Regions:
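Juxtamembrane transmembrane-helix termini in multi-pass membrane transport proteins
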Residues: 20-73
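A helix-boundary/kink motif common to multi-pass secondary transporters
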Residues: 21, 25, 39, 69, ...
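Alpha-helical transmembrane segments of multipass membrane proteins
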Residues: 14-15, 31, 35, 59, ...
Length: 263
């Protein structure tokens, strides 16, 4: 029964990616951990492949509709993808099984990664829901370029650490620095998620035993969801999309924090 629920969750992952341009991993990691019973390390690796492949199909559809800013996608993807690969290939395998202990209290690696995941989600949601001050577009602001590139590198490290495609981090950055309208930010986010996720997954392949049968089936179901989501997105306005995305990320972060702290 739980397994069937998990596959319905796969459709929901694609649906959310199609509507909001992010949030796939916010669903994928909890579904894989809490419903499909994978450990968080394996779930984060699988999440990168599922979300990356699903986003690739969404990117192709958005490209045909001219809802992608290619130059911005490259500028944002390049520094973050370096951070993702370094983290998945070198940093994750080096994190000890017990990250912290004090007396009888122990913080396992898996719990630590889920807590980091939830905290980053919470902060990104608050950023999305707050009213933004006007900023100079990234491509026109030479003084801010280096700072933004450094920030995106660390975004890549966070994406790699928590096994997320990073849409919930990338979309706020696209809105703030690139000044893209929400629907174009969604399309551009999907191509950045594709690059970040699949490069991150390559860093996992040598360190993880992959159940390809399960992974490909789950991903195929998620791809169906993204086509449904892209269809629904056409009928939603920009402000509503932004609010839906921010509230969704906020709610999921609170659920994961509660689950990890009190379970």
């Amino acid at each position: 029964m739980l397994e069937i629920l998990g596959y319905f969750g796969a459709i929901l992952i694609g649906l959310v990616l199609g509507i909001t341009g992010g949030g796939g991993s916010i669903l994928a990691v909890p579904i894989l951990v809490y419903i499909m019973s994978l450990n968080p390390i394996m779930a984060s690796a699988y999440s990168l492949f599922i979300v990356g492949t699903t986003s690739a199909f969404g990117s192709f559809q958005n490209f045909k509709k001219k809802l992608i800013a290619p130059k911005t996608a490259f500028l944002f993807a390049f520094p973050s993808v370096i951070g993702v690969y370094i983290t998945r290939k070198f940093i994750i395998p080096k994190i000890p099984d017990t990250v912290f202990y004090f007396g009888s209290f122990q913080l396992p690696k898996e719990t630590f990664l889920m807590l980091v995941f939830a905290i980053v989600m919470f902060m990104a949601a608050i950023s999305m829901l707050k009213e933004k001050k006007e900023t100079i577009p990234f491509e026109e602001n030479n003084k801010s370029k280096f700072a933004v590139i450094v920030q995106l590198f660390f975004v890549g490290i966070l994406i790699g650490l928590i096994g997320a495609g990073g849409g919930f981090l990338i979309i706020p950055a696209l809105l703030k620095f690139a000044k893209l309208p929400m629907k174009k930010a969604i399309g551009t986010s999907l191509i950045i998620i594709t690059i970040n996720s699949l490069i991150g997954f390559l860093g996992d392949v040598q360190n993880t035993i992959i159940d390809w049968g399960f992974l490909l089936l789950f991903t195929a179901i998620s791809v169906i969801g993204i086509f449904i989501g892209l269809y629904i997105q056409k009928y939603l306005n920009e402000k509503l999309l932004k609010k839906i995305f921010g509230i969704f990320v906020l709610v999921m972060s609170v659920i994961i924090l509660y689950k990890e702290i009190f379970s």
